[in-house]
């Protein structure tokens, strides 16, 4: 019987990050997947990034994860969203060559030391009882083999009792054309895990040769600047990638009428589908009935790769019958002759309510069993990858008897994601938004490396060279800011008012520092560099764009950032008030039973976490603080 330190079940985005983290930290690791051909597959949209999701991807990269580097090697378009808004919500988004992304991820797994990649459907978890505790001991696969493990990470995506719906037709599948896992959920229930149902969906894929692009709005990529998800990607490699345009189309009243007439044939509305779907990624029929006054909805045409004609039609996710899908498509401008290559469908699947896991992503029921990705009730590749990385890290540290890594919501979007899941739970597939973070002006995608690379380095996931690069950037930002603060300029420097007038700013009559000039909304760091060329002894050349952009953001938004840092300081004081593991909530007579039950189940490790649990009031928190003070904590 083969034996591993850690076994990962599932080869999706969570599973890949978990397996790589475990193996790179020195553990003998195996990743099991139903099919080796679908490792790292993008089940729905062939893209990474977008608001808050790019923040997660950048944080994964800063901690030493793989997702950012993988998309940089395989993107076919990249651009920045929300450029007219503030830096907190600006986000990078890349369109992937779907097949290349999966192949590159598989190659990375296969070339990683300490990692075995095995095809096999896991049918059962081997759990034993020791000293009254359930402890994971390994797995069994349908092929009849058993494997021992000290820890197991479950990252099964939509495959647990997956049920696909297309109109009146439904059938078992984990993804279209792939087997669902029917035995593993039974094993999870047998060992005491609670399972519930969620639903998601995916749109039609169209033959790109049958679309009339001349009547659509083009969305080109951005080749004017270096754009990349990973700081370890070379600038020249990112710039050299060939980019393909995306396009925008729209539905119309005729399409909406077709959908309204087919309402009773939609499993979403006729009672066939029981699981709740993602509110922020609704099907087209959901949008039509939820927003009856809207006479059109955007559709996004995104190529699935260099070597395919398949076009992903974002915004047209559906569970309607195929004849209705055909009819509504032909009534969209530009799609009169369009041919469908893959039909849209909805899928229901099992998930474990996230209140069942600890902040480390370990199960509360079975020791050394970790859960990551959609099984925890989330939606999205980046959300899955973030959980996979943290599950891998914490599984390793648990086996080494080391302190767990629990990221604070004030330090990262990953921390916000996990804290939201465990403290609040979710009644729909959870998707990350910048609005979910109260510290979003500090938690920007551009400073993810400054926030988290040191931790990734200490964990052994970030190489020395990358760590030193980030530390140099930190030092350079400070040096440049100090130079700007102490360098005075006046109207005698002809370039000062030249730039100010060109940017629509008021010219100066008296002296100013370069720092004060940079605070002006329309003045960029490039402008400051231009002005500084006329100042003897000042050299602002030779710094990379990443560093100078960081200077510009911190200078322009200094007041807001300082306000956010004060909020974080206040938040940290709550997070630093630890709750003893042996606390007996029954001793707190003033706390209602409902709140006590939640506190007992979730077991918050500090006052901050306790305060965010749904159903726990400020009065309950005050009672806990008084109790801890009386105990001398």
Curated annotation (Swiss-Prot):
Location in the cell: Cytoplasm
InterPro entries given in the database record: FAD/NAD-bd_sf, GIDA_C_N, MnmG, MnmG-rel, MnmG-rel_CS, MnmG_C, MnmG_C_subdom, MnmG_C_subdom_sf
Cofactor(s) listed in the protein's UniProt record: FAD
Annotated Pfam families: GIDA, GIDA_C_1st, SAM_GIDA_C
Keywords on record: Cytoplasm, FAD, Flavoprotein, NAD, tRNA processing
Main subcellular location of this protein, as a coarse class: cytoplasm
Residues at which NAD(+) binds: 277-291
SMART domains: GIDA_assoc_3
Highest taxon listed in the record's lineage: Bacteria
GO cellular component, one term: cytosol
Protein name, per record: tRNA uridine 5-carboxymethylaminomethyl modification enzyme MnmG 2
Organism expressing this protein natively: Fusobacterium nucleatum subsp. nucleatum (strain ATCC 25586 / DSM 15643 / BCRC 10681 / CIP 101130 / JCM 8532 / KCTC 2640 / LMG 13131 / VPI 4355)
Lineage: Bacteria, Fusobacteriati, Fusobacteriota, Fusobacteriia, Fusobacteriales
Gene name as annotated: mnmG2
């Amino acid at each position: 019987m083969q034996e591993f330190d850690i076994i990962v079940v599932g080869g999706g985005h969570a599973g890949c990050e978990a397996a790589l983290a475990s193996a790179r930290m020195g553990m003998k690791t195996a990743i099991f997947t139903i099919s080796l051909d679908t490792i790292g597959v993008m089940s729905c949209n062939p893209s990474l990034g977008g608001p808050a999701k790019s923040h997660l991807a950048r944080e994964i990269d800063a901690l030493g994860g793989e997702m950012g580097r993988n998309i940089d090697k395989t993107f076919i378009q990249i651009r920045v969203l929300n450029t007219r808004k503030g830096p907190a919500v600006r986000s990078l988004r890349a369109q992937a060559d779907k097949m290349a992304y999966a192949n590159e991820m598989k190659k990375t797994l296969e070339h990683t030391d300490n990692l075995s990649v095995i095809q096999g459907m896991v049918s059962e978890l081997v759990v034993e009882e020791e000293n009254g505790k359930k402890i994971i001991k390994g797995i069994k696969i349908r092929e009849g083999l058993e494997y021992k493990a000290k820890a197991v990470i479950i990252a099964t995506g939509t495959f647990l009792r997956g049920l696909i719906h297309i109109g009146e037709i439904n059938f078992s599948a984990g993804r279209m054309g792939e087997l669902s896992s029917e035995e593993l959920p039974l094993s999870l229930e047998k060992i005491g895990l609670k399972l519930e149902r969620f639903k998601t969906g995916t749109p039609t894929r169209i033959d790109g040769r049958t679309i009339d692009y001349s009547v659509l709005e083009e969305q080109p990529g951005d080749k004017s600047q270096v754009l990349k998800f990973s700081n370890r990607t070379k600038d020249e490699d990112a710039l050299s990638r060939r980019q393909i345009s995306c396009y925008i189309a729209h539905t119309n009243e005729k399409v909406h009428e077709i959908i309204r007439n087919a309402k009773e044939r939609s499993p979403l509305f006729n009672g066939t589908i029981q699981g709740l779907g993602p509110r922020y990624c609704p099907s087209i029929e959901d949008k039509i009935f939820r927003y009856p006054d809207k006479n059109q909805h955007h559709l996004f045409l995104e190529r699935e790769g260099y070597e395919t004609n398949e076009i992903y039609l974002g915004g047209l996710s559906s569970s309607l019958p195929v004849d209705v899908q055909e009819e509504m498509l032909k009534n969209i401008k530009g799609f009169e002759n369009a041919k469908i290559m893959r039909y849209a469908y909805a899928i229901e699947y099992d998930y474990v309510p996230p209140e069942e896991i600890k902040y480390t992503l370990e199960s509360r029921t079975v020791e050394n069993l970790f859960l990551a990705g959609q099984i925890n009730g989330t939606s999205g590749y980046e959300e899955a990858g973030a959980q996979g990385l943290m599950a891998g890290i914490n599984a390793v540290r648990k086996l080494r008897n080391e302190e767990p890594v629990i990221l604070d919501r004030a330090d990262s979007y990953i921390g916000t994601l996990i804290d939201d899941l465990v403290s609040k739970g979710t009644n729909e597939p959870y998707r990350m938004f910048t609005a979910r973070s109260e510290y979003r002006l500090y938690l920007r995608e551009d400073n993810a490396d400054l926030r988290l690379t040191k931790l990734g380095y200490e964990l052994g996931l970030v190489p020395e060279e990358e760590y030193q690069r980030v530390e140099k950037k930190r030092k350079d930002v400070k040096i440049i800011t100090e130079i700007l603060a102490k360098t005075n300029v006046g109207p005698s420097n002809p370039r000062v008012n030249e730039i100010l007038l060109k940017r629509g700013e008021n010219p100066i009559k008296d002296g100013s520092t370069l720092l004060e000039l940079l605070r002006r909304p329309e003045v960029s760091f490039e402008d400051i560099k231009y002005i500084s060329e006329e100042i003897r002894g000042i050299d602002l050349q030779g710094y990379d764009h990443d560093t100078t952009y960081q200077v510009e953001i911190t200078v322009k938004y200094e007041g807001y950032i300082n306000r956010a840092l004060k909020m974080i300081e206040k938040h940290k004081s709550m997070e630093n008030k630890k709750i003893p593991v042996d606390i007996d909530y029954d001793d707190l007579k003033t706390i209602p039973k409902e709140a006590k039950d939640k506190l007992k189940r979730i077991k918050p490790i500090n006052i901050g976490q306790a305060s965010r649990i749904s159903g726990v009031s400020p009065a309950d928190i005050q009672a806990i603080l008084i109790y801890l003070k009386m105990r001398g904590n």
